[in-house]
Protein backbone atom coordinates (compact mmCIF):
# COMPACT_ATOMS: atom_id res chain seq x y z
CA UNK A 1 0.00 0.00 0.00
CA UNK A 2 1.21 3.50 -0.81
CA UNK A 3 0.30 6.30 1.58
CA UNK A 4 0.86 10.02 1.03
CA UNK A 5 -0.13 12.81 3.41
CA UNK A 6 -1.18 15.49 0.91
CA UNK A 7 -2.35 18.37 3.10
CA UNK A 8 -3.38 19.36 6.62
CA UNK A 9 -5.76 22.03 7.88
CA UNK A 10 -5.40 21.95 11.64
CA UNK A 11 -5.69 18.26 12.52
CA UNK A 12 -7.88 17.53 9.46
CA UNK A 13 -6.00 15.68 6.72
CA UNK A 14 -6.20 14.83 3.05
CA UNK A 15 -4.24 11.67 2.29
CA UNK A 16 -3.84 9.50 -0.80
CA UNK A 17 -4.02 5.73 -0.37
CA UNK A 18 -3.20 3.28 -3.16
CA UNK A 19 -3.96 -0.43 -2.90
CA UNK A 20 -3.68 -3.15 -5.53
CA UNK A 21 -7.19 -2.28 -6.75
CA UNK A 22 -7.77 1.47 -6.40
CA UNK A 23 -6.42 4.85 -5.38
CA UNK A 24 -8.56 7.08 -3.17
CA UNK A 25 -8.31 10.29 -1.19
CA UNK A 26 -9.26 10.73 2.43
CA UNK A 27 -11.40 11.59 4.29
CA UNK A 28 -13.18 8.57 2.85
CA UNK A 29 -16.45 6.88 3.76
CA UNK A 30 -16.62 3.15 3.05
CA UNK A 31 -20.09 1.72 2.31
CA UNK A 32 -20.74 -1.47 4.25
CA UNK A 33 -21.31 -4.66 2.25
CA UNK A 34 -21.78 -6.99 5.19
CA UNK A 35 -22.23 -10.23 3.23
CA UNK A 36 -20.38 -9.12 0.11
CA UNK A 37 -23.03 -6.69 -1.13
CA UNK A 38 -24.17 -3.28 0.05
CA UNK A 39 -27.83 -4.00 0.78
CA UNK A 40 -30.06 -3.59 -2.34
CA UNK A 41 -27.10 -2.49 -4.50
CA UNK A 42 -24.64 -4.29 -6.78
CA UNK A 43 -21.14 -3.67 -8.08
CA UNK A 44 -22.44 -1.57 -10.99
CA UNK A 45 -24.27 0.74 -8.58
CA UNK A 46 -21.18 1.08 -6.41
CA UNK A 47 -18.89 1.89 -9.33
CA UNK A 48 -21.00 3.75 -11.89
CA UNK A 49 -23.64 5.48 -9.78
CA UNK A 50 -21.67 6.15 -6.60
CA UNK A 51 -18.04 5.91 -7.74
CA UNK A 52 -17.09 4.23 -4.46
CA UNK A 53 -13.38 3.44 -4.43
CA UNK A 54 -13.45 1.13 -1.39
CA UNK A 55 -16.13 -0.84 0.45
CA UNK A 56 -16.19 -3.01 3.56
CA UNK A 57 -17.14 -6.67 3.86
CA UNK A 58 -17.63 -8.61 7.08
CA UNK A 59 -15.40 -11.55 7.95
CA UNK A 60 -17.75 -13.06 10.56
CA UNK A 61 -20.72 -13.28 8.20
CA UNK A 62 -18.81 -14.50 5.15
CA UNK A 63 -16.77 -16.97 7.18
CA UNK A 64 -20.03 -18.61 8.27
CA UNK A 65 -21.75 -18.29 4.90
CA UNK A 66 -20.79 -19.00 2.17
CA UNK A 67 -17.38 -19.76 3.87
CA UNK A 68 -14.02 -18.31 2.94
CA UNK A 69 -13.14 -21.36 0.83
CA UNK A 70 -16.09 -20.70 -1.48
CA UNK A 71 -15.08 -17.05 -1.85
CA UNK A 72 -11.48 -18.10 -2.53
CA UNK A 73 -12.68 -20.46 -5.26
CA UNK A 74 -14.18 -17.45 -7.09
CA UNK A 75 -10.91 -15.55 -6.91
CA UNK A 76 -11.57 -13.74 -3.65
CA UNK A 77 -14.07 -11.00 -2.96
CA UNK A 78 -13.29 -9.16 -6.18
CA UNK A 79 -14.11 -12.17 -8.34
CA UNK A 80 -17.05 -13.22 -6.20
CA UNK A 81 -18.79 -9.82 -6.11
CA UNK A 82 -17.46 -8.31 -9.36
CA UNK A 83 -16.51 -5.14 -7.46
CA UNK A 84 -12.99 -4.64 -8.78
CA UNK A 85 -11.93 -1.79 -6.50
CA UNK A 86 -10.65 -1.98 -2.93
CA UNK A 87 -12.11 -4.13 -0.16
CA UNK A 88 -11.51 -3.70 3.56
CA UNK A 89 -12.51 -6.67 5.70
CA UNK A 90 -12.96 -6.46 9.44
CA UNK A 91 -11.80 -9.30 11.69
CA UNK A 92 -15.27 -10.44 12.72
CA UNK A 93 -14.50 -9.86 16.38
CA UNK A 94 -17.23 -7.26 16.83
CA UNK A 95 -19.91 -9.58 15.43
CA UNK A 96 -18.65 -12.52 17.49
CA UNK A 97 -19.00 -10.21 20.49
CA UNK A 98 -22.37 -8.67 19.59
CA UNK A 99 -24.28 -11.46 17.82
CA UNK A 100 -23.31 -14.39 20.01
CA UNK A 101 -24.98 -14.19 23.42
CA UNK A 102 -22.48 -16.65 24.88
CA UNK A 103 -19.21 -15.50 23.34
CA UNK A 104 -16.14 -16.09 25.50
CA UNK A 105 -12.92 -14.11 25.32
CA UNK A 106 -9.66 -15.91 26.17
CA UNK A 107 -6.03 -14.97 25.62
CA UNK A 108 -6.11 -17.47 22.73
CA UNK A 109 -9.05 -15.79 20.96
CA UNK A 110 -12.84 -15.46 20.92
CA UNK A 111 -15.13 -18.49 21.10
CA UNK A 112 -18.67 -17.94 19.85
CA UNK A 113 -21.81 -19.61 18.59
CA UNK A 114 -22.97 -19.11 15.02
CA UNK A 115 -26.13 -17.02 14.84
CA UNK A 116 -27.16 -19.22 11.89
CA UNK A 117 -27.07 -22.77 13.30
CA UNK A 118 -25.62 -22.53 16.80
CA UNK A 119 -22.35 -24.27 15.89
CA UNK A 120 -19.31 -23.26 17.94
CA UNK A 121 -16.29 -21.52 16.45
CA UNK A 122 -13.02 -19.98 17.60
CA UNK A 123 -11.49 -16.84 16.12
CA UNK A 124 -7.78 -16.44 16.81
CA UNK A 125 -5.31 -13.78 15.60
CA UNK A 126 -4.04 -16.25 13.01
CA UNK A 127 -7.35 -17.77 11.92
CA UNK A 128 -9.00 -14.43 11.10
CA UNK A 129 -6.03 -13.57 8.88
CA UNK A 130 -6.25 -16.97 7.17
CA UNK A 131 -9.89 -16.22 6.40
CA UNK A 132 -9.01 -12.79 5.02
CA UNK A 133 -6.21 -14.27 2.91
CA UNK A 134 -8.91 -16.36 1.23
CA UNK A 135 -10.97 -13.19 0.68
CA UNK A 136 -7.91 -11.46 -0.83
CA UNK A 137 -9.08 -8.21 0.72
CA UNK A 138 -6.89 -5.16 0.19
CA UNK A 139 -6.98 -4.14 3.86
CA UNK A 140 -7.29 -6.72 6.64
CA UNK A 141 -8.16 -5.94 10.25
CA UNK A 142 -6.57 -7.84 13.13
CA UNK A 143 -8.52 -9.52 15.91
CA UNK A 144 -9.03 -7.22 18.90
CA UNK A 145 -10.69 -7.58 22.29
CA UNK A 146 -13.74 -5.31 22.29
CA UNK A 147 -15.59 -4.41 25.47
CA UNK A 148 -19.01 -2.81 25.83
CA UNK A 149 -19.08 0.58 27.51
CA UNK A 150 -19.28 1.43 30.31
CA UNK A 151 -16.69 -1.09 31.50
CA UNK A 152 -14.60 -1.49 34.64
CA UNK A 153 -11.01 -0.27 34.61
CA UNK A 154 -9.87 -3.85 35.16
CA UNK A 155 -11.79 -5.13 32.10
CA UNK A 156 -10.46 -2.29 29.95
CA UNK A 157 -6.89 -3.15 30.99
CA UNK A 158 -7.46 -6.81 30.08
CA UNK A 159 -8.84 -5.70 26.71
CA UNK A 160 -5.75 -3.62 25.97
CA UNK A 161 -3.39 -6.37 27.15
CA UNK A 162 -5.10 -8.89 24.86
CA UNK A 163 -5.29 -6.51 21.93
CA UNK A 164 -1.54 -5.82 22.16
CA UNK A 165 -0.81 -9.55 22.53
CA UNK A 166 -2.98 -10.39 19.52
CA UNK A 167 -1.47 -7.52 17.49
CA UNK A 168 2.05 -8.90 18.02
CA UNK A 169 0.89 -12.38 17.06
CA UNK A 170 -0.94 -11.09 13.96
CA UNK A 171 1.88 -8.94 12.58
CA UNK A 172 4.44 -11.73 13.11
CA UNK A 173 2.17 -14.26 11.41
CA UNK A 174 1.43 -11.92 8.51
CA UNK A 175 5.11 -11.36 7.80
CA UNK A 176 5.79 -15.10 7.94
CA UNK A 177 2.92 -15.79 5.52
CA UNK A 178 4.13 -13.13 3.10
CA UNK A 179 7.55 -14.78 3.15
CA UNK A 180 5.72 -17.90 1.91
CA UNK A 181 4.02 -15.93 -0.87
CA UNK A 182 0.64 -15.66 0.89
CA UNK A 183 -1.02 -12.30 1.50
CA UNK A 184 1.13 -10.44 -1.01
CA UNK A 185 -0.54 -7.12 -1.83
CA UNK A 186 -2.75 -7.39 1.25
CA UNK A 187 -2.33 -4.79 3.95
CA UNK A 188 -2.90 -5.13 7.68
CA UNK A 189 -4.25 -2.57 10.15
CA UNK A 190 -3.88 -2.67 13.92
CA UNK A 191 -6.78 -1.70 16.19
CA UNK A 192 -6.44 0.54 19.23
CA UNK A 193 -8.65 -0.35 22.18
CA UNK A 194 -8.94 1.15 25.67
CA UNK A 195 -12.53 2.28 26.02
CA UNK A 196 -12.65 5.93 27.08
CA UNK A 197 -9.72 5.50 29.49
CA UNK A 198 -7.04 8.01 28.45
CA UNK A 199 -4.06 6.09 29.81
CA UNK A 200 -5.17 2.72 28.39
CA UNK A 201 -5.84 4.23 24.94
CA UNK A 202 -2.43 5.89 25.04
CA UNK A 203 -0.75 2.64 26.10
CA UNK A 204 -2.41 0.71 23.30
CA UNK A 205 -1.65 3.36 20.67
CA UNK A 206 2.02 3.61 21.63
CA UNK A 207 2.41 -0.18 21.57
CA UNK A 208 0.79 -0.58 18.15
CA UNK A 209 2.74 2.37 16.75
CA UNK A 210 5.90 0.34 17.34
CA UNK A 211 4.62 -2.47 15.11
CA UNK A 212 4.85 -2.34 11.30
CA UNK A 213 1.13 -2.10 10.58
CA UNK A 214 0.07 -0.42 7.32
CA UNK A 215 -2.54 1.62 9.19
CA UNK A 216 -4.12 2.04 12.59
CA UNK A 217 -7.78 1.89 13.52
CA UNK A 218 -9.62 3.22 16.54
CA UNK A 219 -12.02 0.54 17.74
CA UNK A 220 -14.42 0.20 20.62
CA UNK A 221 -16.21 3.54 20.23
CA UNK A 222 -19.83 4.28 19.34
CA UNK A 223 -20.77 1.34 21.59
CA UNK A 224 -22.74 3.19 24.24
CA UNK A 225 -20.68 6.22 25.24
CA UNK A 226 -21.84 9.84 24.81
CA UNK A 227 -20.77 11.56 21.58
CA UNK A 228 -18.75 14.17 23.47
CA UNK A 229 -16.76 11.41 25.15
CA UNK A 230 -16.09 9.73 21.80
CA UNK A 231 -14.83 13.01 20.33
CA UNK A 232 -12.63 13.64 23.38
CA UNK A 233 -11.17 10.13 23.17
CA UNK A 234 -10.29 10.54 19.48
CA UNK A 235 -8.76 13.97 20.04
CA UNK A 236 -6.65 12.73 22.94
CA UNK A 237 -5.28 9.93 20.74
CA UNK A 238 -4.10 12.23 17.97
CA UNK A 239 -0.61 12.99 19.38
CA UNK A 240 0.11 9.27 19.75
CA UNK A 241 -0.80 8.23 16.20
CA UNK A 242 1.81 7.96 13.47
CA UNK A 243 1.16 10.81 11.05
CA UNK A 244 2.40 8.73 8.11
CA UNK A 245 -0.20 5.97 8.35
CA UNK A 246 -3.96 5.98 7.71
CA UNK A 247 -6.28 6.43 10.70
CA UNK A 248 -9.59 4.58 10.63
CA UNK A 249 -12.47 5.12 13.09
CA UNK A 250 -14.48 1.91 12.99
CA UNK A 251 -18.28 1.81 12.79
CA UNK A 252 -18.84 5.58 12.92
CA UNK A 253 -21.29 7.16 12.23
CA UNK A 254 -23.68 10.08 11.72
CA UNK A 255 -22.79 12.95 9.37
CA UNK A 256 -22.00 15.01 12.47
CA UNK A 257 -19.67 12.24 13.69
CA UNK A 258 -17.78 12.31 10.41
CA UNK A 259 -17.28 16.09 10.50
CA UNK A 260 -16.24 16.13 14.17
CA UNK A 261 -13.76 13.28 13.80
CA UNK A 262 -12.24 14.53 10.54
CA UNK A 263 -11.53 17.71 12.48
CA UNK A 264 -9.72 15.49 14.99
CA UNK A 265 -7.49 13.82 12.39
CA UNK A 266 -9.45 10.71 11.28
CA UNK A 267 -9.09 9.58 7.65
CA UNK A 268 -11.41 6.59 7.16
CA UNK A 269 -14.95 5.73 8.25
CA UNK A 270 -17.56 3.02 7.78
CA UNK A 271 -21.11 2.67 9.07
CA UNK A 272 -24.35 0.86 8.20
CA UNK A 273 -26.33 4.00 9.05
CA UNK A 274 -26.93 5.38 5.52
CA UNK A 275 -28.33 2.10 4.18
CA UNK A 276 -30.09 0.99 7.37
CA UNK A 277 -31.81 4.36 7.73
CA UNK A 278 -32.69 4.28 4.04
CA UNK A 279 -34.59 1.03 4.48
CA UNK A 280 -36.52 2.65 7.34
CA UNK A 281 -37.49 5.62 5.17
CA UNK A 282 -35.01 8.15 6.56
CA UNK A 283 -33.10 10.35 4.12
CA UNK A 284 -29.99 12.42 4.83
CA UNK A 285 -29.67 15.89 3.30
CA UNK A 286 -27.56 19.00 3.83
CA UNK A 287 -30.40 20.37 5.95
CA UNK A 288 -30.61 17.34 8.22
CA UNK A 289 -32.61 14.13 7.97
CA UNK A 290 -36.31 13.42 7.53
CA UNK A 291 -38.61 10.42 7.13
CA UNK A 292 -40.40 10.04 3.81
CA UNK A 293 -43.42 8.24 5.29
CA UNK A 294 -44.92 11.50 6.58
CA UNK A 295 -48.20 12.55 4.98
CA UNK A 296 -46.74 15.93 3.96
CA UNK A 297 -44.77 14.20 1.19
CA UNK A 298 -47.69 12.43 -0.53
CA UNK A 299 -48.03 15.11 -3.23
CA UNK A 300 -44.53 16.59 -3.02
CA UNK A 301 -43.00 17.06 -6.47
CA UNK A 302 -39.54 18.04 -5.16
CA UNK A 303 -36.55 15.71 -5.13
CA UNK A 304 -35.23 14.49 -1.78
CA UNK A 305 -32.41 17.01 -2.04
CA UNK A 306 -33.21 19.71 -4.62
CA UNK A 307 -29.49 20.33 -5.22
CA UNK A 308 -28.52 16.65 -5.01
CA UNK A 309 -27.10 15.02 -8.15
CA UNK A 310 -27.68 11.37 -7.19
CA UNK A 311 -29.62 9.01 -9.48
CA UNK A 312 -32.67 9.10 -7.20
CA UNK A 313 -32.87 12.89 -7.01
CA UNK A 314 -32.26 13.29 -10.75
CA UNK A 315 -35.22 11.09 -11.58
CA UNK A 316 -37.82 10.78 -8.82
CA UNK A 317 -39.96 12.91 -6.51
CA UNK A 318 -40.60 12.75 -2.80
CA UNK A 319 -44.20 11.90 -3.62
CA UNK A 320 -43.16 8.83 -5.61
CA UNK A 321 -40.76 7.69 -2.90
CA UNK A 322 -43.47 8.19 -0.26
CA UNK A 323 -45.70 5.90 -2.33
CA UNK A 324 -43.02 3.23 -2.80
CA UNK A 325 -42.22 3.17 0.91
CA UNK A 326 -45.85 2.83 1.96
CA UNK A 327 -46.45 0.15 -0.70
CA UNK A 328 -43.43 -1.77 0.65
CA UNK A 329 -42.02 -1.84 -2.87
CA UNK A 330 -38.50 -3.30 -2.93
CA UNK A 331 -37.41 -0.68 -5.47
CA UNK A 332 -37.57 1.84 -2.64
CA UNK A 333 -34.62 0.22 -0.86
CA UNK A 334 -32.33 0.73 -3.85
CA UNK A 335 -33.41 4.32 -4.54
CA UNK A 336 -33.15 5.34 -0.89
CA UNK A 337 -29.77 3.63 -0.43
CA UNK A 338 -28.37 5.29 -3.54
CA UNK A 339 -29.34 8.71 -2.22
CA UNK A 340 -28.03 8.24 1.32
CA UNK A 341 -24.71 6.76 0.21
CA UNK A 342 -24.31 9.52 -2.36
CA UNK A 343 -24.87 12.03 0.44
CA UNK A 344 -22.18 10.43 2.63
CA UNK A 345 -19.67 10.14 -0.21
CA UNK A 346 -20.36 13.72 -1.27
CA UNK A 347 -19.91 14.90 2.33
CA UNK A 348 -16.47 13.26 2.34
CA UNK A 349 -15.61 14.95 -0.97
CA UNK A 350 -16.69 18.36 0.36
CA UNK A 351 -14.52 17.87 3.45
CA UNK A 352 -11.51 16.98 1.28
CA UNK A 353 -12.06 20.12 -0.77
CA UNK A 354 -12.37 22.30 2.34
CA UNK A 355 -9.16 20.88 3.85
CA UNK A 356 -7.23 21.45 0.63
CA UNK A 357 -8.50 25.05 0.62
CA UNK A 358 -7.61 25.57 4.30
CA UNK A 359 -11.28 26.33 4.97
CA UNK A 360 -12.39 23.37 7.10
CA UNK A 361 -13.38 25.60 10.04
CA UNK A 362 -15.72 27.59 7.79
CA UNK A 363 -17.03 24.37 6.23
CA UNK A 364 -17.94 23.08 9.68
CA UNK A 365 -19.75 26.32 10.54
CA UNK A 366 -21.76 26.13 7.31
CA UNK A 367 -22.48 22.43 7.90
CA UNK A 368 -24.13 23.15 11.25
CA UNK A 369 -25.76 26.41 10.07
CA UNK A 370 -27.71 24.53 7.39
CA UNK A 371 -28.97 22.22 10.12
CA UNK A 372 -30.12 25.12 12.26
CA UNK A 373 -27.43 24.54 14.87
Swiss-Prot record:
The reaction(s) catalysed by this protein are:
7-aminomethyl-7-carbaguanine + guanosine(34) in tRNA = 7-aminomethyl-7-carbaguanosine(34) in tRNA + guanine
Can you name this protein? Queuine tRNA-ribosyltransferase
Q: How does it assemble?
A: Homodimer. Within each dimer, one monomer is responsible for RNA recognition and catalysis, while the other monomer binds to the replacement base PreQ1.
Q: Name one GO biological process term.
A: tRNA wobble guanine modification
Listed A to Z, the keywords are: Glycosyltransferase, Metal-binding, Queuosine biosynthesis, Transferase, tRNA processing, Zinc
Q: Which organism is it from?
A: Campylobacter jejuni subsp. doylei (strain ATCC BAA-1458 / RM4099 / 269.97)
Q: Which residues form the active site?
A: 90 (proton acceptor), 270 (nucleophile)
Obligatory cofactor(s): Zn(2+)
Question: Which pathway?
Answer: tRNA modification; tRNA-queuosine biosynthesis
**Enzyme Commission (EC) number:** 2.4.2.29
Which residue intervals make up region (RNA binding)?
251-257, 275-279
Query: Family, per the entry?
Result: Belongs to the queuine tRNA-ribosyltransferase family.
- Which GO MF term does the entry hold, naming one? tRNA-guanosine(34) queuine transglycosylase activity
The UniProt record gives the binding positions of Zn(2+) as 308, 310, 313, 339
Cofactor binding: number and manner: Binds 1 zinc ion per subunit.
SUPFAM superfamilies cross-referenced by the UniProt entry: tRNA-guanine transglycosylase (SSF51713)
Quote the function comment for this protein.
Catalyzes the base-exchange of a guanine (G) residue with the queuine precursor 7-aminomethyl-7-deazaguanine (PreQ1) at position 34 (anticodon wobble position) in tRNAs with GU(N) anticodons (tRNA-Asp, -Asn, -His and -Tyr). Catalysis occurs through a double-displacement mechanism. The nucleophile active site attacks the C1' of nucleotide 34 to detach the guanine base from the RNA, forming a covalent enzyme-RNA intermediate. The proton acceptor active site deprotonates the incoming PreQ1, allowing a nucleophilic attack on the C1' of the ribose to form the product.
Q: Name one GO cellular component term.
A: cytosol
Taxonomic lineage per UniProt?
Bacteria, Pseudomonadati, Campylobacterota, Epsilonproteobacteria, Campylobacterales
A Pfam family recorded for this sequence: TGT
Alphabetized NCBIfam families for the sequence = Q_tRNA_tgt (TIGR00430), tgt_general (TIGR00449)
For the ligand (substrate), the binding residues are 90-94, 144, 193, 220
Amino acid sequence: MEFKLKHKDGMARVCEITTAHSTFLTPVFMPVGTVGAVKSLDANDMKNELDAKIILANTYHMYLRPTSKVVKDFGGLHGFTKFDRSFLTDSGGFQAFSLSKNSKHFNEGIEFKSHIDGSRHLFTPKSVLDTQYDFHSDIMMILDDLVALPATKERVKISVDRTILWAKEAITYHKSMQNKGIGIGQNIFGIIQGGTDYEERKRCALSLNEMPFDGLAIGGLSVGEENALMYETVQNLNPYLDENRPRYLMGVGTPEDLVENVERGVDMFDCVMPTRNARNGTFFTSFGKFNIKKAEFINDHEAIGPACSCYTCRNFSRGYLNHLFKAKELTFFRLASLHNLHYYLELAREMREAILNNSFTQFKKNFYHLRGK
